[in-house]
């Protein structure tokens, strides 16, 4: 099922009991951040939150934890809310194979209802607050930022839709952090080499299929809009920006048009990041906002970031697993079974594979490290046998504890690249990486003494169903 806009998805969540509307007055700080943290603490079935009465703001509405649970993630895919995680993974992989899905272009969009072209003041337009108490200011952290390759502007796939943290630096200024591993950093370098500003458009309050696509580690020339269409099973709707040639999500609640100022930098940060730590302040580029559009009575969406798990981990979980899975299958089409890279955006990945010969699992681990996402993330790759479910951590721990020999099966590779936000990197952006081979040795490897593994009694599956039926009576 394709949701036409953010509001339609919220309505679907409400119908399924996965949206909690709060009408009592709340304070922007600390209530909004605390409520999102509390929702995450409730477990992997927690609801989205919609606040309609925020102290200090008139008619402001804020949504949080929108896809911060597996039921909500399943509904984003148009699946029943009780769909198991592994089934969501394989369904996402199936839809990934439908990429690219052509887009549907529209002439106008709901956010054109209101247009601000002068005296722009983001402090008046947006209900701003700090997510975590140590943040260095107000941030937009779940907005889709659109930019385009300047060397190949007609290549639709090289238009990027990404999610980057942006600090409100003034009434019409934002600081942005374009880390080197992200496409927008390439676009900014192209602009600054030419001595020109980089046009950008920022969309807030989008339906979750595009925020999911925007946080998926696609190849440089793969379109997030065409991926969003593949995920939802029908063309994704876009509309042209008025100040540039950029395409914008049709269903956005608020849209900001502007440009990154060439050569200009300001101190940005600190900010509580997806790693569960604050990242320190750095000198970062500045966006000048020139025009603002918004729907009547817009809904502002925010993303809580903190110690995992939070909504961020659901948003960048399965959509990180699937590209790694597909890229590994390109190299080993008959062996790769599944990939779990849901933890901290794939800084650790677990790969289930068949083994063709001795040492094969280590080769799989090497390939994972050199995928586009692996280059900037994947610090540790755990490789397990085909009969070990990488989404079942007790099984993975069993494989590590019984199959891995620390002397022979731990491979450490020094001084590889990682995103600078990794708090363990030293210097920032450089780290050692490790492959842990937790597969059963096959010839010509002869170490260990592995007898036939235990299996389940013959009627176990039938008894599982019988017990579930009895529990549900």
UniProtKB/Swiss-Prot annotation:
Catalytic residues identified in the record: 273 (proton donor)
Record GO biological process: catabolic process; response to toxic substance; ubiquinone biosynthetic process
EC number: 4.1.1.61, 4.1.1.-
GO MF: 3-octaprenyl-4-hydroxybenzoate carboxy-lyase activity; 4-hydroxybenzoate decarboxylase activity; metal ion binding
Top EC class for this record: lyase
Keyword Manganese belongs to the record: yes
Coiled coil (UniProt feature): none
InterPro entries attached to this UniProt entry: BsdC, PAD_UbiD-like, UbiD, UbiD-like_C, UbiD-like_N, UbiD_Rift_dom
Catalytic activity: 4-hydroxybenzoate + H(+) = phenol + CO2; vanillate + H(+) = guaiacol + CO2
Domain of life: Bacteria
Induction: Up-regulated by salicylate via the transcriptional regulator BsdA.
UniProt note: phenotype after gene disruption: A triple bsdB-bsdC-bsdD deletion mutant no longer converts vanillin to guaiacol, the conversion stops at vanillic acid.
Record keywords, A-Z: Aromatic hydrocarbons catabolism, Decarboxylase, Detoxification, Flavoprotein, FMN, Lyase, Manganese, Metal-binding
Protein's UniProt keywords contain Flavoprotein: yes
Xref: NCBIfam families: UbiD family decarboxylase, VdcC
Protein name stated in the entry: Phenolic acid decarboxylase
Species name: Bacillus subtilis (strain 168)
